[in-house]
Amino acid sequence: DELVHLLGDEVSEVDFSKKPTVIMMVGLQGSGKTTTSGKIAKLIKTKYAKKPLLVAGDIYRPAAVDQLVTLGKQLDVPVYEKGTSESAENIVKGAMNYAALNNNDVIIIDTAGRLHIDEPLMQELANVKEIAKPDEILLVVDSLTGQDIVNVAASFNEKLSITGAVLTKL
């Protein structure tokens, strides 16, 4: 209830009229951002007949890049990845250019998990937000996190103005 109160009671749909529509996935480590990114890409491709692009923006966990590439192959959705040697900001810049050249309707940016109190990593998210200008910023939350999630959501919202939340592992 507190999370709903924090984000607002109004339900809204993603507006796909702007091309590309940019969705940025944020949250704590292990919350399910990468898997959720793939699920959202599948939904956007099948239900809305859009051409999504997955962006591997987690430069701290090589397995996340591999996982997203595997999901992309399974879903027949392209994945823009540069491994872990470039900054998240540079990867997102490259992805924006790639999407423009390849007519991708929707860009889904999978970011690295981080603690809300880790200021340098939170600043990285703010930088990515500035570059990508996302239409949606979704906080991915492990449903087993407990009451502290209200503080986590408030911190992410203060820094990024999140537009929604996804509860995982229900």
Q: Which residues does each predicted region cover?
A:
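Gly/Ser/Thr-rich helix-start
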Residues: S31-K33, D58, R114, Q147, ...
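Conserved catalytic-core segment of NTP-binding enzymes
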Residues: S87-L101, H116-L170
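Thr-Gly-centered strand-to-loop micro-motif
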Residues: V55-A56, E81-K82, T111, L139-V141, ...
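Short, glycine/polar-rich helix-capping loops at beta-to-alpha or helix-loop-helix junctions
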Residues: P62-L68, I149-V152
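Short, glycine/acidic-enriched loop or turn micro-motifs at the edges of active sites
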Residues: R61, T84, G113, T145
